[in-house]
Amino acid sequence: MYKNYIFDLYGTLIDIRTDEWSEEPWEEFAAWLTGNGMPYTGSEVKALYDNEVNRLTSVKTKYTSPEIDIIPVFEVICKKHRPDITDEEVWKAGEQFRIITTKMIKLYPNTKKVLTGLKKAGKKVYLLSNAQRVFTWQELVKTGIVDDFDDIFISS
């Protein structure tokens, strides 16, 4: 039997559905930003978000599909209206965006049982993901599996 087990998160341990395409989540995110001193309409914040994502993904790299760190995108969005915003507040904006755009999140059947069983058997359990840390961490906590890993490696 193996001593170490490495898992991806989304599509392996967690089933999630997000909506970053329809108008409603952008309007809700804009309302949250406006309430925090960063006035936007939904279409304005979506356009800025899309522009920054496109700018960052267009940077030449040796990889065919590079995974960007999304925090700089939220930094641009936030600093446009609040130049002195803290890193913690930018992080909170990223978390709030994910909360708003998440339509469903749940563990796949037996996920907790498998992770707990491996730990009880003395095995090392690791998470290796190319996801966004700002999104992933709160979802690990929310689903109750954050403490089931010996270590967590997230690319962003």
PLM region descriptions:
Residues 19-22, 140-144:
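Short, glycine/charged-enriched secondary-structure capping and boundary segments
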Residues 1-47:
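Active-site neighborhood of HAD-like aspartate-dependent phosphohydrolases
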Residues 90-107, 111-141, 152-155:
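Substrate-recognition element of Asp-dependent hydrolases with the DxDx(T/V) motif
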Residues 146-150:
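Conserved H-loop
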Residues 30, 42-96:
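A metal-dependent, Asp-based hydrolase signature
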Residues 18-21, 37, 62, 66, ...:
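Pocket-edge positions in alpha/beta enzyme catalytic cores
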